[in-house]
Amino acid sequence: MAVKFIDGSSKLFIVREYATMRDGQTLVKISDREGKCIWVSADCLEVLEG
């Protein structure tokens, strides 16, 4: 699944995995084209078609 940040950035990321925390927040592990991965809050991402 492809996603991008909701701040208007055009850079695309691929979702690798996700986790729901005890407080209900969802974290998503995303990677860029170089394969670098980071965990971010799902609230700051927009899902793209695909």
Segments the model singles out, each with a brief description of its role:
Residues 46-50:
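Short hydrophobic/aromatic patches at helix-to-coil boundaries
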